[in-house]
Amino acid sequence: MIDEARPLLVFFFSERSGPARRMESLLAHLARKERERMRLRRIDVDLRPDLAERFRVAEVPTLVLVKERRVAARLDGRVSSPRIEAMLEQHLPALEPAAA
């Protein structure tokens, strides 16, 4: 699959945000688990306020799922793994069965 075809999960965070720091390991695990179906990018809002403004980030952490160059879904604030996975399942391509 072409890299650009996979949906992109953008994690807006700040080093100063405790809730965002606590989500780091959860997202790292999720990125490894779903690496065939999505990409993950981290954006520090303190270093890239332009992107935070463009995506209308009002709080950190914020997750924005970009699919086909459009925002498909978002979760604002600290959220649990089940909520993130539920959001992703609605938008990620189905896993292809492994060859026998």
Listing of model-derived features with the role each one plays in the protein:
Residues 64-99:
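Non-catalytic, surface beta->alpha helical segment in thiol-disulfide oxidoreductase systems
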Residues 19-34:
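Typically the conserved alpha-helix immediately C-terminal to a functionally engaged Cys/Sec
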Residues 9-10, 40, 63:
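Hydrophobic beta-strand anchors of alpha/beta hydrolase catalytic cores
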Residues 3-16:
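Short active-site neighborhood of thiol/selenol oxidoreductases, capturing the structured segment around
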Residues 14-17, 57, 69:
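Receiver (REC) domain active-site loop signature in two-component systems and cognate sites
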Residues 55-64:
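Structural micro-motif
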Residues 45-50:
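Structural microenvironment flanking redox-active thiols in thiol-disulfide oxidoreductases
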Residues 3, 34-36:
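Short, structurally constrained coil/turn elements
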